[in-house]
Amino acid sequence: MTKTYHIAVLPGDGIGPEVMAQASKVLDAVRQRFGLKISTSVYDVGGAAIDRHGSPLPAATVAGCEQADAILFGSVGGPKWEHLPPAEQPERGALLPLRKHFKLFSNLRPARLYQGLEDFCPLRSDIAARGFDILCVRELTGGIYFGQPKGREGQGMHERAFDTEVYHRFEIERIARIAFESARKRRSKVTSIDKANVLQSSILWREVVNGIAADYPDVALSHMYIDNATMQLIKDPSQFDVLLCSNLFGDILSDECAMITGSMGMLPSASLNEQGFGLYEPAGGSAPDIAGKNIANPIAQILSLTLLLRFSLGKDDAADAIERAINQALEQGYRTADLAGDGHAIGTHEMGDIIAKFVVEGV
């Protein structure tokens, strides 16, 4: 009997509803082609939820997500809500509580330079010509952002501020397994990023990662210091497959990976817990300046759906079909404004239609 899956859809603010509508088209195409039983429910989140319910994350939204197999998230925030106290603003009041509530400890950020988009890569042309396809696996719940003690004390010239980098063995083990399992489905290479020549937390990180690697003899492991990694990403990103990073180092490298692709409109993101439940979202923001103009690139949102199908639902064939459809659209010259340069640009809705069509046709 075919299992029925349920997705909680949270469009959010800005371009969120527009690009989410395109992901919904592609989901319909996947259902049609593969006979999948996937239902969806739409819930308010972010600024839209503040306007309707007085809270960026209403209880009904959380309850709906609890009943789902995964969350497909749009984007939140905008100048309309910047006057609110920081904790009540859409970004901090919605996304962070969702991550905490569902214990999402791992963040996966693919960064790929698609064929035909080399001119948008800021790297030297000979480097861009080699292409790259990187998955940045970042630990989300430990490290210096959450370690205690932290604070400020003293006055005048003796005032000081401090943060604490703390990692437990279990935190490193579980994120390392995510990286190695992901590498098995890719090119079987993991590069673990640390600062083991200086930091005790990085020494433990390296020891634990080496131990986990013994369970994956088919995956090649290398270690790289964070300062060298930032340089190597610019020098030759094609050398990397899966980057395994702590919270701080992953924050830095995932944004660097994003920048060298040439467009934030192409970058999805997945945040997972130990049960495989995930929140999937574009890596970019809500872009309120272009909302409602039919010019936003929906591919990041569509690729977020691809990650959802792959990691939470285990539907690799459907995920592969969407990725092939996106490749086909780009290879045939279809571009939204962020990728068109001086050439012809199509709209948000048109790009969604084309990708959905290619999914159904099975290109």
From Swiss-Prot:
User: Which catalytic reaction applies to this protein?
Assistant: (2R,3S)-3-isopropylmalate + NAD(+) = 4-methyl-2-oxopentanoate + CO2 + NADH
Under the heading HAMAP family, the entry gives:
LeuB_type1 (MF_01033)
What InterPro entries does this protein map onto? IsoCit/isopropylmalate_DH_CS, IsoPropMal-DH-like_dom, Isopropylmalate_DH
Question: Mind telling me what this protein is named?
Answer: 3-isopropylmalate dehydrogenase
Q: Which PROSITE patterns match?
A: IDH_IMDH (PS00470)
State the free-text cofactor note.
Answer: Binds 1 Mg(2+) or Mn(2+) ion per subunit.
How it assembles, according to the record, is: Homodimer.
Q: Where does NAD(+) bind?
A: 78-91, 285-297
Q: What is its EC number?
A: 1.1.1.85
**GO CC term (a single one):** cytosol
- Alphabetized Pfam families for the sequence: Iso_dh
Site note Important for catalysis, residues: 145, 195
Q: Its annotated pathway? A: Amino-acid biosynthesis; L-leucine biosynthesis; L-leucine from 3-methyl-2-oxobutanoate: step 3/4
| Example GO biological process | L-leucine biosynthetic process
Q: Where does Mg(2+) bind?
A: 227, 251, 255
Which top EC class is named for this enzyme in its record? oxidoreductase
Q: Which family does it belong to?
A: Belongs to the isocitrate and isopropylmalate dehydrogenases family. LeuB type 1 subfamily.
Concerning SMART domains, the annotation shows:
Iso_dh (SM01329)
Named cofactor requirement(s): Mg(2+); Mn(2+)
Query: Species name for this entry?
Result: Yersinia pestis
For the keyword Metal-binding, the answer is yes
Subcellular locations according to the entry? Cytoplasm
